[in-house]
A protein has these predicted regions:
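N-terminal nucleotide/polyanion-binding subdomain common to many enzyme families
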Residues: 2-102, 109
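Conserved beta-alpha
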Residues: 11, 88-161
Length: 161
């Protein structure tokens, strides 16, 4: 799978406040705000965009592995999925600014799927896990959320740990 370079697409980035966390622009947002911003952008975008939910491991890996860091830098938005990242974000904020919230991948995904009611036509692509997990997840989402539309799913080959 090739990660597209979105830097030449004007407006590809998700409009939100960010702060630098070890060299990466991480969103200062809540799950609700981010899901609304992503849903609105998805409906107006002519191409897919990339969202990373970054915990401390992901950020640290991006710092120490330049190839991985380059992939992170090409994300349209990086959400703080882990309290150490949130704490670092909050240390970057000025006195009086609102505090950053954790925007975990699963919470964000569920909020986006729930938002299909407000944003009909929203489609979702599932990436990661094994094929059995993706099948079970897509089935559960279709059952729980009748408006859920699956654009596709991909289980990449993983290296052994």
């Amino acid at each position: 799978m090739t990660i597209p370079d979105n830097s030449d697409r004007p407006g590809a980035r998700i409009p939100c406040e960010t702060r630098n966390v070890f060299g990466f622009s991480v969103a200062v947002s809540s799950v609700e705000e981010m899901s609304a911003a992503l849903a609105e952008r998805a409906l107006e975008a002519e191409a897919p965009f990339l969202v990373a939910a970054a915990d401390a491991h992901v950020v640290t890996l991006g710092v120490h592995d330049r190839d991985y860091g380059n992939v992170l830098e090409r994300m349209d938005v990086i959400c703080p999925d882990g309290m150490p990242v949130v704490w670092r974000l909050n240390r970057r904020l000025s006195s009086g600014e609102r505090e950053a919230c954790r925007v975990s991948g699963p919470d964000l995904m569920e909020a986006l799927v729930r938002s299909n009611v407000r944003y009909p036509g929203l489609r979702h692509f599932l990436l990661g896990g094994d094929e059995k997990l993706l099948e079970a997840l897509s089935g559960a989402l279709k059952e729980k959320y009748p408006g859920f539309q699956l654009a596709g799913a991909y289980s990449p080959p993983f290296r052994p740990w």
